[in-house]
Amino acid sequence: IMVRNYMFRLVQLFALEKEDRLAELLDYLDEVPDFGAILDDYFDEYDDIDSGPEARGPEFFRLGDTDSRAWSVRQIIKDPDGDHAYQFVATVDLDASDEAGEVRLSDLRVEY
C-alpha cells in the first residue's frame, strides 16, 4: 500500500503542476526527470489530469515481480482522452526503503 500511495502522490503533485515539490521529493535520486518540460509536453496534448478516485484505481497501477528486493512499478496517468500515454515508471529499492523508513526509488522516468 505504501508503494501505491507513493506513486499516486507523484500523480497528484504532477496534476497540481508542483514540479519543484516533485524534484524535492526525489532529490535523493541520481537523475530526476525534468518535470517542467514533461508538464509542458503533457499540457500541450491535454487540458487536465484526473487525480480523482478512479485515477487511483488498480487499472492505473502495475506492480512487477516482487520476488527480489527491487520492485518495478508503473503508475499510469489518467488523461481526459483515455490515451494513458503518460506513465511514471520506477524501481522501488526495498533495502533503501527499509533504511529510510519510507518508500525509496532507485530510478524514475516518465514515459510518453
Predicted regions and their residues:
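Long amphipathic alpha-helical scaffold segments
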Residues: 1-5, 29-50
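Short, low-complexity N-terminal intrinsically disordered segments enriched in polar/charged residues
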Residues: 1-16
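Acidic surface patches and DE-rich sequence motifs
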Residues: 26, 79, 95-97
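Short beta-strand edge/turn micro-motifs at domain boundaries
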Residues: 85-112
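Long, compositionally biased intrinsically disordered terminal regions
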Residues: 16, 60-62, 102
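Surface-exposed, charged secondary-structure patches
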Residues: 39-87, 93
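Short, well-ordered alpha-helical segments enriched in acidic and aromatic residues
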Residues: 16-30
